Amino acid sequence: MSQTRKKTSSEGETKPQTSTVNKFLRGSNAESRKEDNDLKTSDSQPSDWIQKTATSETAKPLSSEMEWRSSMEKNEHFLQKLGKKAVNKCLDLNNCGLTTADMKEMVALLPFLPDLEELDISWNGFVGGTLLSITQQMHLVSKLKILRLGSCRLTTDDVQALGEAFEMIPELEELNLSWNSKVGGNLPLILQKFQKGSKIQMIELVDCSLTSEDGTFLGQLLPMLQSLEVLDLSINRDIVGSLNSIAQGLKSTSNLKVLKLHSCGLSQKSVKILDAAFRYLGELRKLDLSCNKDLGGGFEDSPAQLVMLKHLQVLDLHQCSLTADDVMSLTQVIPLLSNLQELDLSANKKMGSSSENLLSRLRFLPALKSLVINNCALESETFTALAEASVHLSALEVFNLSWNKCVGGNLKLLLETLKLSMSLQVLRLSSCSLVTEDVALLASVIQTGHLAKLQKLDLSYNDSICDAGWTMFCQNVRFLKELIELDISLRPSNFRDCGQWFRHLLYAVTKLPQITEIGMKRWILPASQEEELECFDQDKKRSIHFDHGGFQ
């Protein structure tokens, strides 16, 4: 959210008071102000915040200069204690370990933030039971646009007070109440003030124990939320009972861009219900139906309207128990989603023998940046089809093939893809039964200057690679100048001595300026090599974590 500094016409009128406050700033806050001036993209300066507060009609006037200065000092101390700076539009106290006393101090701060647009106090358990004190001050922050209260242990009284306060913040655009179980069964109380013409653009209600009745209410409310762009109802399994109502409401949210129904207990019937709404969601960019294990078979007869989502960029169907008929049906639809950038079909075991045509047609998705098909039990034919199609995916940045055993011994099928992938940043080949020849091929590709953009490489759980293979790899990994994370851990049941390749790895690390994490779990280091690692840790100023889980 851009927060540019604005000069008000009343600056001249408030000069005496501003001058007094600036004296205070020159004392205890001079250093803080200097740091802010150095950051050209920073939020408003503390002096701006206090000056605007001084001229604001909404802030309660203080009876004397001494009281004003005392309040400023208390507020500054509170923010500094939490490692925060005074800003006039954004107050982010996410995961700050706020205590009950802190909450009281924060409430006292609100009158000095009349231009506040964003308030985030998520992941602070002590917020629960104290929200009334905040909502009673909502009229002082009537410009609020973003309110995040995720995982705050809100009580029934909290959510009721919140619902009554919404009419005092008519500019609200984003609301996050995720991971608050008391929201469930009380959604009408919370959203009762949302009326036609509401400016709300984002509603996130993840894991809120929503009931079927909540879903029915939401379905009736949706037609009033014409500005809604993001709706996340993930991990609320009971709303499946009111999916008809929700889908009916979705037909009136033509501006919706993100719909997340991850782990909502969706069934085969659910796909047909949602399919009827898709034709009205022409602006949808992201659709997440993942982790709905009873969804399998639902796409067999009802994927037709998916093709209407012309602007869809992200489709997540991982762990949906897709059947062979589902895959066949999706083969007719997914290749037509020409704007698709991210596709996740992982953990659908039936794809292994039925996805040859689908994977072959991925070549028609030139914008695809992320392809995740780990743990799909791919077979030789399907992997070959994927390898041939992947050559045409020049924009690919994330490629995850982990837990597909057929990759082992066949990495050569991806040789052209690896050579042509100028944008690839993440490559995951964990538990792919890779053999020495595979890792030697990978080393050769790296040595010749390919995969230059790679940032994360996962080769873990490939225990069949011999020491000679690891030596070739470690001798060449130094050419991956942008590498941040590398994982070569062994399986949990396997322990193995490190070979001489470990010295090559240590040398390579000195040539990798970005590396921060190296996974080496269950590799056994002899005493001499452990000493080398300790010396390396002491000599190098960079922070690199060797994750070994305790060398044996």
Curated annotation (Swiss-Prot):
Keyword Repeat: yes
Segments of this protein annotated with the region Disordered: 1-65
SMART domains referenced in this protein's UniProt entry, alphabetically: LRR_RI (SM00368)
Keywords assigned: Leucine-rich repeat, Repeat
LRR repeats: from-to residues: 227-246, 255-275, 283-293, 311-331, 339-360, 367-387, 395-415, 423-443, 453-475
One protein family per Pfam: LRR_6
Extent of Polar residues compositional bias: 42-58
Xref: InterPro entries: Leu-rich_rpt, LRC31, LRR_dom_sf
Top-level taxonomic group: Eukaryota
Protein name: Leucine-rich repeat-containing protein 31
Species for this entry: Homo sapiens
Gene behind this protein: LRRC31
